[in-house]
């Protein structure tokens, strides 16, 4: 959405394989809220909305007060970033904030920058056999460095988004990691 809006003279369809609907995060947002976190959806342009009516959730990306500066500010002050591997995910990393990426694609992306936190990646399905590929099969078929929707079509595979349940389970893991880090820091200072 961001690229299509600001750089209109070029087609960005080749990035479509990275997209996923915001509705897939609804269970996870509710989980974070149940755990007393405030959840702020960032981004200057976004598609879709979550139907969540809770004072601990703010869809800043669809608000009238959004700005690129405020995106940077919010991500510099957040406790963690949890979301997709679009360009904005690099901001919390640059502020040394924990960041947990979902629907990461291509697989190579989870190794592309120094990472201290886990990520989950999209599964890849062989359209000919209808089989989900193993990591070894992805490597053997050179799918770890596939960067366009057209390349995936040529290789006769599709990317499958992480399910709502997989994303929620990853969120549980993320909070466990943060809690362990906090406990370790507290133990050092006691």
List the model feature ranges, each with a label.
Residues 1-13, 148-155:
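Short glycine/proline-rich turn/loop motifs
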Residues 1-8, 20-68:
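Catalytic donor nucleotide-activated moiety binding site of glycosyltransferases and closely related
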Residues 13-21:
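N-terminal core-binding DNA-recognition domain of tyrosine site-specific recombinases/integrases
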Residues 23-26, 69, 86, 90, ...:
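A structural signal for well-ordered alpha-helical segments within the folded catalytic domains
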Residues 26-30, 34, 73-76, 172, ...:
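Surface-exposed alpha-helical segments enriched in charged/polar residues
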Residues 54-58, 114-119:
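Short low-complexity, flexible loop/linker segments enriched in glycine and/or proline
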Residues 71-118:
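A donor-sugar binding/catalytic signature common to diverse glycosyltransferases
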Residues 115-190:
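Leloir-type glycosyltransferase catalytic cores
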């Amino acid at each position: 959405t961001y690229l299509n809006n600001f750089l209109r003279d070029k087609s960005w369809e080749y990035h479509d394989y990275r997209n996923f609907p915001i509705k897939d995060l609804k269970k996870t947002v509710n989980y974070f809220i149940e755990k007393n976190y405030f959840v702020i959806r960032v981004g200057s342009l976004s598609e879709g909305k979550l139907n969540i009516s809770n004072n601990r959730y703010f869809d800043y990306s669809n608000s009238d007060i959004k700005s690129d500066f405020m995106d940077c500010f919010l991500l510099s002050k957040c406790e963690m970033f949890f979301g997709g591997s679009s360009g904005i995910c690099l901001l919390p990393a640059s502020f040394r904030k924990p960041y947990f990426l979902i629907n990461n694609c291509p697989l190579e992306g989870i190794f592309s920058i120094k990472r201290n936190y886990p990520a989950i990646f999209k599964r890849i399905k062989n359209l000919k056999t209808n089989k989900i590929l193993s990591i070894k099969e992805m490597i053997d078929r050179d799918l770890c460095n596939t960067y366009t929707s057209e390349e995936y079509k040529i290789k006769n595979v599709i990317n499958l988004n992480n399910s709502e349940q997989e994303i929620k389970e990853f969120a549980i893991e993320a909070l466990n990691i943060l809690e362990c880090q906090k406990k370790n820091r507290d133990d050092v200072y006691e």
